[in-house]
Amino acid sequence: MNIAIFTIGCKVNQYESDSLASLFKKKGYSIIDNIEKAHICIVNTCTVTHRADYDSRRLLRQIIKKNPQAICVATGCYAQIAYKKLAQIKGIDYIIGNKEKAELIKLLPYLKKQSFPQILVEKNPTTLDTLVCFPPSDRDTIKRTRAYLKIQDGCDAFCSYCIVPYARGRARSLSPEEVIKHIYYLQNQGFKELVFCGIHLGEYGKDLFPPISFLSLLKLVKDQGLDLRIRLSSMNPAEINYQFIELFENWPNLCPHLHISLQSGSENILQKMGRPYTVDKFKEIVLDLKYRFPYFAIGVDIIVGFPGETERNFLQTYNLIKEMPVSYCHIFSYSDRPGTKSAKMKEKVPLEIIKKRVKALRQLDKNKRAQFFKENMGRTVQVLIEQKVDGFSKGHSENYISVYMEEKTEINQIITVKLIDYFHDGVYGKIHRGK
């Protein structure tokens, strides 16, 4: 039987999809990416923005149209939050929540076409107190060189704009022992790089007994003497301190790259969002990192058009990014999420103004990326070869630059490369054979 799995959204979603694919393959199912040839199509949905909702619905409708005979399954965060709305789409057979997602391996033999969607959703995920375990994936199943490892799920922050705690539940963590076991499994699979991911990494370990911090977990991983690169996914500025930054100095395996969920450069907007840090805290982190490590990659998330965001508030964000040595930005247009505090706020920013501000920030993002690439020209970096693209080998450096080479290389090898010139979305390089 052929199963196609499609993923929308974050690295946690991707990790869970990869895990399911590996479990299915071990049970004898074939994992494909062709809708027309699939017997079962699973969409792991996202609901972080209005656009993610739309993309989830569009993909489900596309599957139903292209292959009406296939069993269509919607799971993930949008399925968790909007199961009643999804149930109105004719052709969806099953709507499965985040808690129930892990049970898909047991449900598969019993799935069949339905006249009406069957809904399997825990109605109140905020009551979940244990981590739903998804085992790490096999490299021959996902055919990727970079492995994700979900070590944490859920969030207790309840920021005013964010629906994620309602879709993912409260913060829960994988035990340090399980984390270490999974890391060795992935290393033995042949992965050369591991990305720690979670809904709120900084909350890792607070729910465990005894509690353990994310920093303490990283130190424990460091002591294992692993032979693979470690990369971190998004971090909250409030959880990055001196000891955390110091770890990058003492651990060569830890990639010099952080993605910081800033969201706004306006103190007023940060307070309305319920974010637990100041602009000065963000500045302190960025300047300290760049002082210690001049080629450190720093990415930021920005939400544009939060209710009440004035032109002055926006310019505070724009000028902060312009002045700080930020490497790149991920820019999101604000959209109301049902049930959140900000959805009830007045002073909504008109869509045309949001679009104008997004356009300005995206141009600034292009400038920031170009400047970061320029600073790295002539350097030698360690590139993990990930794929072949139009005759080029493509991979990422330790500081997250997309690097292209014409020379023949093997996928899943780390190669020393000299960066030469701008190229596509990254930099053109040549293998460095000197000392």
Q: What is each model feature region?
A:
Residues 1-204, 219, 243, 258, ...:
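Proteins enriched for Cys/Gly/acidic motifs involved in redox and nucleic-acid/cofactor modification
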Residues 72-73, 81-82, 86, 188-311:
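Conserved SAM/AdoMet-binding glycine-rich loop
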Residues 344-435:
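Terminal RNA-binding accessory module
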Residues 142-145, 155-156, 254, 264, ...:
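Short flexible coil/turn linkers enriched for glycine and charged/polar residues
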Residues 309, 325-326:
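Contiguous mid-protein beta-loop-alpha structural module that forms a pocket-lining wall or clamp
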Residues 1, 29, 70, 93, ...:
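A structural micro-motif
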Residues 47-48, 168-169, 208-211, 272-277, ...:
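Short glycine-enriched, charge-decorated loop/helix-capping segments at active-site entrances
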